[in-house]
Amino acid sequence: MYCGSCIRDNSLAAGLGRLGWDVTLLPLYTPIRVDEEDNSVDQVFFGGLNVYLQQKIPLFRHLPAFVDRWLDNPKLIRRVASKAVNVSASELGDMTLSMVRGEHGHQAKEVKRLVHWLKEIGKPDLICLTNLLVGGSIPALKRE
């Protein structure tokens, strides 16, 4: 299955790159899945597996960074996503609200990681969030 958001974001990044812009595409939840050249960095922010576990099991909200890196590994996420994993939409409501709460939600350390990466590594002039589920990060992004 290919996500329309992945295709749109990857095409936008490629098009802006052809126009001479320096563009960094950060995958959210899962690695970018497209048929054409993948224009994203080889990291996943708010990794779907990690975010889900942080929501369901409080211990995962306090694990060290090396465990988070393992859970957010694109190869691991691809492997898990390739299995027939069904999550009921009715089970995702609390996680959706938590994500929108940003720094005050169960995924607060994911917000901190994204903000740190953008501030210290990415250093963008412009940030375009094409998925408003991470909109809870906006106050932290504006502050930093």
What do the predicted segments below correspond to?
Residues 25-113, 121:
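A conserved catalytic-core segment of Leloir-type glycosyltransferases
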Residues 19-24:
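A generic structural motif
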Residues 1, 32-36, 135-138:
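Short catalytic/ligand-binding loop motif for oxyanion handling, primarily in non-cytosolic enzymes
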Residues 130-134:
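Short His-centered aromatic/hydrophobic patch
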Residues 126-128, 141-144:
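Active-site proximal beta-strand in glycosyltransferases
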Residues 5-16:
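Short amphipathic alpha-helix
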Residues 1-7, 106-107:
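A short, glycine/small-residue-rich beta-strand->loop->alpha-helix junction that serves as a flexible
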Residues 118-124:
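Glycine-rich phosphate-binding loop signature in dinucleotide/nucleotide-binding domains
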